[in-house]
């Protein structure tokens, strides 16, 4: 394959920037750019040892002084001869070094091409390749740890274990189909059934992590609802750490949904500040209220706010208005927290409504001004969305979940066929379908267009 080059670090002023090379002509391209200060020839540079020297353009112009390091195919990221040039992190300098590499014969790397070559050369499977981009995009420490575990094979290992077991089953049934006169079926039926049951349990457990994994990767869609002036926008601003939403003493300031991300208790929340839920003749406010209700339908978690400074001691009409959002949350079927806001203003007598509703996961008194109660809010959210234990990896994307689901369905069908006494070829067909689904997951049997789509998500240089 042709030798490729790209800038591997962010193109903004920094102490260090890196240009990567990979391919058969890596040493030749590097020799055209880099002159070791020791006088040693680039071809003689030892692997995995940093060497100081000059970095020059094709016409000999000094571009920078920096370090070069070479990697053998056996010990490189891509599985090919590779090298890195470490220079000062000026975008201008990095661009000139990259252009010099092109002048020496290297080609511009496509997005994700380094990782794609690692996959093609057997350094990574597809689950590990996907973990690379997940690690780059991680927005919380927990999502970064999950991606790191997946990159180290935490998802690959149980999938490979199931795949190997299924291969053993299919080999047994091929023997039965190919040699029908041999007494093989009865000897292996009970063991085969146990094997399929073990595979079913493993795949079911993996698929069961998808709901949590999806939330871990994309964040918890969290609707903040309440009556007008209940403190919704103030809470949003306090959680994100800056004034994202306009806050005034005028009820109905927020007329549309406002979205922002925040990490609360180590959990990524996609916060949706909604318009106050109330009856109104104003057309714009009506649209805002409808969007608020839609946000509740789409949410994973609901934060229902009640003005804790007045509670339900207001007029009957106002009390009904304040209760409406709580009723919506309680009847949504979603996990919800009742937040009694404005605790810094006192009050709060007779706050909690005595209604025959599904109780909230927690009732928390808090202040968006003093941050009183925020520790309790973080603890409640962490209880709802606990961190994965140990080095296990959660399934985090729809491609992985779909492949596991199809494999699980086929394993169950094979087990049912075996228990029903159906012919070996029927069982074999289902087992092979499960193998193919798992092969797509790891990349053994993945289509070229699907593989290309995965690597299109990567940045250039990775």
Residue map of PLM features:
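C-terminal-of-GTPase-core extension/linker across diverse P-loop GTPases
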Residues: 2-14, 141-263, 280-282, 294, ...
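A glycine-rich (often HGG/GG-containing) alpha/beta subdomain
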Residues: 1-145, 149, 153, 329-332, ...
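Glycine-rich, N-terminal phosphate-binding loop of Rossmann-like dinucleotide-binding domains
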Residues: 21-22, 87-89, 239, 274, ...
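Generic enzyme active-site microenvironment
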Residues: 271, 305, 339
């Amino acid at each position: 394959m042709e030798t490729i080059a790209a800038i591997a670090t962010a193109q903004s002023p920094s102490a260090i920037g890196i240009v990567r090379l990979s391919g058969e002509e890596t040493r030749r391209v590097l020799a055209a750019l880099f002159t070791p200060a020791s006088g040693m020839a680039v071809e003689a540079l030892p692997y995995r040892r940093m060497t100081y020297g000059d970095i020059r353009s094709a016409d000999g112009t000094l571009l920078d002084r920096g370090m070069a390091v070479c990697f053998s195919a056996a010990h490189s990221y891509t599985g090919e001869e590779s090298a890195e040039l470490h220079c000062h992190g000026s975008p201008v300098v990095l661009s000139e070094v990259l252009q010099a590499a092109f002048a020496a014969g290297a080609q511009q790397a496509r997005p994700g091409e380094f990782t794609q070559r690692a996959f093609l050369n057997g350094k990574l499977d597809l689950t590990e390749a996907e973990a690379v981009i997940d690690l780059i995009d991680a927005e919380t420490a927990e999502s970064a740890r999950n991606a790191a575990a997946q990159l180290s094979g935490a998802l690959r290992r149980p999938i490979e274990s199931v795949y190997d077991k299924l291969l053993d089953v299919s080999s047994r049934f091929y023997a039965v189909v190919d040699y029908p006169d041999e007494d093989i079926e009865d000897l292996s039926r009970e063991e085969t059934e146990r094997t399929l049951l073990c595979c079913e349990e493993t795949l079911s457990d993996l698929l069961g992590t998808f709901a949590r994994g999806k939330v871990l990767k994309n964040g918890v869609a969290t609707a903040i609802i309440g009556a007008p002036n209940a403190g919704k926008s103030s809470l949003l601003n306090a959680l994100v750490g800056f004034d994202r939403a306009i806050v005034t003493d005028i009820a109905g300031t927020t007329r549309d949904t406002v979205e922002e991300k925040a990490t609360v208790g180590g959990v990524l929340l996609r916060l949706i500040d909604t318009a106050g839920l109330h009856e109104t003749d104003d057309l714009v406010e009506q649209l805002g209220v409808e969007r608020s209700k839609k946000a509740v339908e789409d949410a994973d978690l609901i934060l229902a706010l009640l003005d804790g400074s007045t509670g339900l001691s207001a007029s009957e009409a106002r009390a009904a208005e304040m209760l409406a959002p709580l009723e919506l949350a309680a009847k949504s079927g979603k996990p919800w927290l009742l937040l009694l806001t404005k605790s810094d203003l006192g009050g709060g007598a007779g706050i909690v409504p005595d209604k025959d509703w599904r109780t909230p996961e927690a009732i928390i008194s808090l202040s968006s001004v003093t941050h009183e109660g925020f520790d309790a809010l973080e603890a409640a959210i962490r209880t709802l969305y606990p961190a994965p234990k140990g080095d296990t990896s959660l399934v985090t994307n729809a491609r992985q979940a779909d492949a596991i689901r199809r494999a699980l369905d086929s394993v169950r069908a094979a087990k049912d066929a075996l228990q029903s006494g159906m012919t070996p070829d029927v069982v074999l067909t289902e087992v092979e379908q499960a193998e193919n689904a798992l092969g797509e997951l790891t990349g053994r049997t993945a289509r070229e267009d699907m593989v290309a789509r995965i690597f299109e998500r990567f940045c250039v240089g990775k």
